[in-house]
Amino acid sequence: MKLRLSDTLNSLMLGGLLMASTFASADNKPTKPYWQDVQVVAVNKEYPRSSFMTYENRANALTGKFEKSKYYQLLNGTWKFYFVDSYKNLPANITDPAISTADWADIKVPGNWEVQGHGVAIYTNHGYEFQPRNPQPPTLPEANPVGVYRRDIDIPADWDGRDIYLHLAGAKSGVYVYINGQEVGYSEDSKNSAEFLINKFVKPGKNVLTLKIYRWSTGSYLECQDFWRISGIERDVFLYSQPKAALKDFRVTSTLDDTYKDGIFKLGVDLRNNGSTAGNMTLVYELLDANGKVVATGEKATNVAAGETRTVSFDQTLPDVKTRTS
């Protein structure tokens, strides 16, 4: 299999990421609910990665638009919505796909539920809106509102045999994910994206996606900034798919040599094989300048065992680069 980096990537996020989290499995449930357990901030969630999309050809990749990929499906729009002022008032079967949503409200996604008629928006410049005085971390109020979002999703027939991911670009605060009534996983850290591998939960054609979102979670103690305290799905929701053997993540390091004339380009690419057998993979990258001209390229072959990830690295000097200062 040959992977061309320029066919796969359309955007890159550079920066530092500090993680202090526990990635748990839904098969090993804690005694406390996830949203009350300070030791759990993610369940069955994919490790964070750079932002990019998978495309079927180079031309579509170069547009830089996710919607140009046949392996991308945006889920923004009108969803069904059920709201309660306290989690204690939530029906036990609320995530059952068989229950009717005829009496549920409509809600726009993305969009905070407080500005769409559900609950109360709170502004404070410091302190915790749910416990203004004498907070006792990780204790949360019993009157913790919950919003349940639901919609149908359609899995294309040509995605069969591929890895299928659900991407939540931002949802606040504690998010449980269900597909066809089965728990997929959980996420906090509401200003960062969350991804879930959903292959074993979906079938070709119609499926029911449900998100159960708690307004406050133990993660809320790390989200105390000077802004409106509002809740719900705040950014895009989408599905995408990749081959079983695919590019999982990449890192770019760019600097100058000691003369400050030549550029030093370093690329690290993580290739993951979710197939049942080892696979021979060839990675090809292209680096383009502002005019679309290829200024660097490279190719390497490697073997990735089933269920494993392997990093492929490239180093190249770019003579007489156009430098800039900030």
Residue ranges and their predicted role:
Residues I198-K200, S313-S326:
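Short, hydrophobic beta-strand segments
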